[in-house]
């Protein structure tokens, strides 16, 4: 659940893939959304302060490096807001190497093992991945369906493909599904 009592600062970033809204509080970056994407800034308070902060400046610097096709060697201060389960999924996303991909099922297996469970739902993982509010930096675009389907990116499948191409990920066997978002 979002903490809507903290002051939220915002800045825009013009990327090669479209305009991005960045949001941060005093702790770190809370959101990074392409204008108009699914779940766009939905948990932010209406009253926002358009002002640069350390976290926003670092996020902009990170994006500058990233959009040149290079892997940034630092992370801006992050403050993703979500349940313990979502936080666990987002932590796994941060471990996916630049230019590589994993599946929803593999993340589910990893989390199940860590929690001492025999199994975990890939669909539950997909829900947490889909609600990542710090896209690109917390790289939800690096998660694909088990069959290679490029599904479930709130910024749009076309952007997901472009982000993976920018990272020079091996796209062999990947495809855009005709409909649905099966994991």
Language model region names:
Residues 7-19, 70-183:
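Nucleic acid-binding interface residues in structured DNA/RNA-binding domains
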Residues 24-75:
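Compact structured core domains
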